[in-house]
């Protein structure tokens, strides 16, 4: 919302309804049936398919957990979406053994792995990913055909495996739980505002890094949190517009 999305619909396990309703006042809620693991059940697939036609873009994976149902839902979204799809976190983990399914999506896809998720996609170690981040980014692009956002120190973005944007904003204090979810949400918001996926990813990475630097200067790296970064976004976006 702080990055300009006009409306957000949040799909979540219905058992989490009390917690979600108390913490998400700006969102339209879509509670879904859970499986025995307490995660979103694949029995919701028809309902999810119906919702896809009502969106400008879809983000899948943040906080979902990872099991067979997660994979089935992620594959359904990719095969049926007519709007751009952003895949993060457990969406990536659920698809790691069938990552090529991303190529079946007829709409643009943005995938946002951190080094650990990138290593699982590529079947290598994190140290191998970090040793040559551009090569890892290229390899993920070749497997998926997606815009790749390889997070970490100096986040890298590519849309073709040949040209790379290396981000220079941000600091180590941003390496905290929820920071990656925030980035995916910013990219989602920008795409919903009709910014092309690669540009949305680049602008999202840059803007979040700026927010992280502002928060670090206000509160220190130890005091850098996604909530505080999110609060800085409207001012950053206004300055970038000017």
Regions found by a protein language model. Give the residues of each.
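Small-residue (G/A/S/T)-rich helix-start motifs and N-terminal tracts that mark the onset
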Residues: 1-86, 93-110, 115-242
């Amino acid at each position: 919302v702080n990055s300009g999305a006009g409306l957000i619909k949040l799909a979540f396990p219905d058992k989490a309804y009390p917690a979600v309703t108390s913490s998400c006042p700006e969102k339209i809620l879509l509670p879904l049936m859970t499986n025995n693991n307490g995660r979103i059940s694949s029995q919701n697939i028809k309902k999810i398919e119906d919702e896809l036609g009502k969106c400008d873009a879809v983000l899948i994976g943040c906080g979902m957990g990872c099991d067979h149902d997660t994979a089935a839902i992620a594959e359904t979204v990719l095969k049926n979406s007519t709007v751009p799809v952003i895949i993060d976190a457990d969406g990536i983990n659920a698809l790691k053994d069938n990552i090529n399914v991303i190529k079946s999506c007829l709409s643009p896809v943005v995938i946002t792995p951190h080094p650990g998720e990138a290593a699982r996609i590529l079947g290598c170690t994190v140290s191998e990913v970090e040793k040559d981040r551009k090569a890892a980014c290229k390899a993920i692009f070749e497997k998926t055909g997606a815009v790749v956002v390889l997070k970490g120190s100096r986040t890298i973005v590519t849309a073709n495996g040949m040209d790379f944007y290396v981000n220079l904003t941000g600091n180590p204090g941003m390496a905290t739980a929820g920071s990656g979810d925030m980035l995916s949400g910013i990219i989602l918001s920008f795409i919903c505002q009709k910014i092309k996926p690669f540009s949305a990813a680049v602008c999202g990475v840059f803007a979040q890094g700026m927010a992280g630097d502002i928060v670090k200067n206000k509160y220190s790296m130890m005091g850098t949190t996604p909530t505080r970064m999110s609060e800085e976004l409207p001012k950053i976006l206004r300055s970038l517009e000017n």
